[in-house]
């Protein structure tokens, strides 16, 4: 028969109260605090079995509080807060990002930036997916990418720079997106395993350039990409950018749509590209309104 998690929680509360009232002779007080923390963790896991995730998170937080304030065990506290993050993630994402931040600070204070980066990435995912908070997701992904980069984990950093670029573009910050796409493209040019993806990064950077409505800069950027990777000029992605630049420069919406339709038949446009292309299309309509 499964143990009632509320009974375990009450036992933890009683043990904690007993420790707080005791005199601490012969180390008894510290043992009681440790027992209380262990009981809270047992209660948390029992709540998890019942899928009572919010209650589980609260018990993990109580254990972390004891580890921090009574036992002076910051690593144990960080582990408890990570467990709280996991159970809060779906049901209480605001609590999840708060709890994991405590663990992240502990790892950075200890100089363990690789581990901190991994959990900062997890926090960013919650901001992006559960909380739908693009600005905070961008900030968290950026921090994680910087920590990975400083730790020499270039591939992990680049994966997150691409997330920053994607989200920045969807948030309307096309210049920031261009910068990050170009950064990853440059890093990938000298890597045989990553080189195939360069055309995708240049395409995305080029689309963001077109979305800024600055056709002079867009022309310069597209030319720059061809110079950095001459093989890019033989790719469909390059030809699409050239065609869309011509259409945008001449405010030719029909050409824009025809070239997109032709490309889409060969290489299906994903949701991100569709969103940025919609912004470019809207720029055509704004130009029409200015001259009407």
From Swiss-Prot:
Compartment annotation: Membrane
Keywords of the record: ER-Golgi transport, Membrane, Protein transport, Transport
Keyword Membrane: yes
GO biological process, one term: intracellular protein transport
GO cellular component: cytosol; SNARE complex
Keyword Phosphoprotein: no
InterPro entries: NSF_attach (IPR000744), TPR-like_helical_dom_sf (IPR011990)
Main location as per UniProt: membrane
Disulfide bond residue pairs: none
Annotated membrane topology: Peripheral membrane protein
GO-annotated molecular function: ATPase activator activity; soluble NSF attachment protein activity; syntaxin binding
Superkingdom as given in the UniProt entry: Eukaryota
Family to which the UniProt record says this protein belongs: Belongs to the SNAP family.
Function: Required for vesicular transport between the endoplasmic reticulum and the Golgi apparatus.
PANTHER family: ALPHA-SOLUBLE NSF ATTACHMENT PROTEIN (PTHR13768:SF8), SOLUBLE NSF ATTACHMENT PROTEIN SNAP (PTHR13768)
The protein's name: Probable vesicular-fusion protein sec17 homolog
Organism: Neurospora crassa (strain ATCC 24698 / 74-OR23-1A / CBS 708.71 / DSM 1257 / FGSC 987)
The organism's taxonomic lineage, starting at the top: Eukaryota, Fungi, Dikarya, Ascomycota, Pezizomycotina
